[in-house]
From Swiss-Prot:
GO MF annotation terms: G protein-coupled receptor activity; olfactory receptor activity
Protein name (Swiss-Prot/TrEMBL): Olfactory receptor 11H12
Name of the gene: OR11H12
Extracellular compartment spans: 1-44, 94-112, 180-216, 281-287
Location of this chain's protein in the cell: Cell membrane
Cellular component terms (Gene Ontology): plasma membrane
Task performed by this protein: Odorant receptor.
């Protein structure tokens, strides 16, 4: 039963006298319900993390764009991945930071679904780009003689565009379907972002087919890309172990190690969050998992790539004027 007498900010009852549905003007992102001093601490912590994430990924994207020696397919993919990370973290964190200092913590109906759309679309584009990067590594190590003829600049650009386009089309239909569903009061989403799991709890009518559709799409994009990456690196590992030179094996492992570390970091948190849709997870744990994937993963990705890659470190030193920081 929907509480007809409950008055909640942002809800307008339908004119029909016996209707229990409501038009939602806005949602309330509850976030972390804690004392004001802790809210200030979290705001400072996440603001610093956000600034470091933007700086790190921005530095890598800028350096790869400036240094013509790094205008190769591998670094073009990496530069686009860093650029994607900037937009991905910016799709949710700024609003989250505002809510830490706000008493109302509201977000408009359109704003909520736009945040949902960009958060999932950019995340899907990242998954696809990680898969393309694994394919690039496979060609470079397993098919070195054919690599220059296959992975041309033209194909590289096409693959990047394909990742962006497919990423933004993948969750378009679910977003439209969810936005058309009727809601009942209250309009409080017990989360830090507009996530589909807590949002489904506000529906007046159960929609298991739409939920199954959303989770199926999430599972397909996660497991499909993950299995392709595992398959690519299985072939890469077989080729590397067959190399007669220890120097060649070490170089190949160092090249693939950074990408594998990023893949492990991204997919481990993704599988926990969206393959098992909140079953057995407390609300607080779901918030922490989302924060980890939305903020911590983009923060560490540039560190992983820059610390393991001599070419990127050299380019950063050149751009920053041979600083001792790097």
């Amino acid at each position: 039963m929907c509480p007809l007498t409950l008055q909640v900010t942002g809800l307008m009852n339908v004119s029909e006298p016996n209707s229990s549905f409501a038009f939602v003007n806005e949602f309330i992102l509850q976030g972390f319900t804690c004392e004001w001093t802790i809210q200030i601490f979290l705001f400072s912590l996440f603001t610093t993390t956000y600034a470091l994430t933007i700086t790190g990924n921005g530095a890598i994207a800028f350096v790869l764009w400036c240094d013509w020696r790094l205008h190769t397919p591998m670094y073009m993919f990496l530069g686009n991945f860093s650029f994607l990370e900037i937009w991905y973290v910016s799709s949710t964190v700024p609003k989250m930071l505002v809510n830490f200092l706000s008493e109302k913590k509201n977000i408009s109906f359109a704003g909520c679904f736009l945040q949902f759309y960009f958060f999932f679309s950019l995340g899907t584009s990242e998954c696809l780009l990680l898969t393309v990067m694994a394919f690039d590594q496979y060609l470079a190590i397993c098919r070195p003689l054919l690599y220059p003829n296959i992975m041309t600049g033209h194909l590289c650009a096409k693959l990047v565009i394909l990742c962006w386009v497919c990423g933004f089309l993948w969750f378009l239909i679910p977003i439209v379907l969810i936005s058309q569903m009727p809601f009942c009061g209250p309009n409080i989403i017990d989360h830090v972002v507009c996530d589909p799991g807590p949002r489904f709890a506000l529906d007046c009518v159960s929609a298991p087919r739409i939920q199954l559709f959303c989770y199926t799409l999430s599972s397909l994009v996660i497991f499909g890309n993950f299995l392709f990456i595992i398959g690519s690196y299985t072939l890469v590992l077989k080729a590397v172990l067959g190399m007669p030179s220890s120097t060649g094996r070490h170089k190949a492992f160092s090249t693939c190690g950074s990408h594998l570390a990023v893949v492990s970091l991204c997919y481990s948190s993704l599988m926990v969050m969206y393959v098992s849709p909140g079953l057995g997870h407390s609300t607080g744990m779901q918030k922490i998992e989302t924060l980890f994937y939305a903020m911590v993963t983009p923060l560490f990705n540039p560190l992983i790539y820059s610390l393991q890659n001599k070419e990127i470190k050299a380019a950063l030193r050149k751009v920053l004027g041979s600083s001792n920081i790097i």
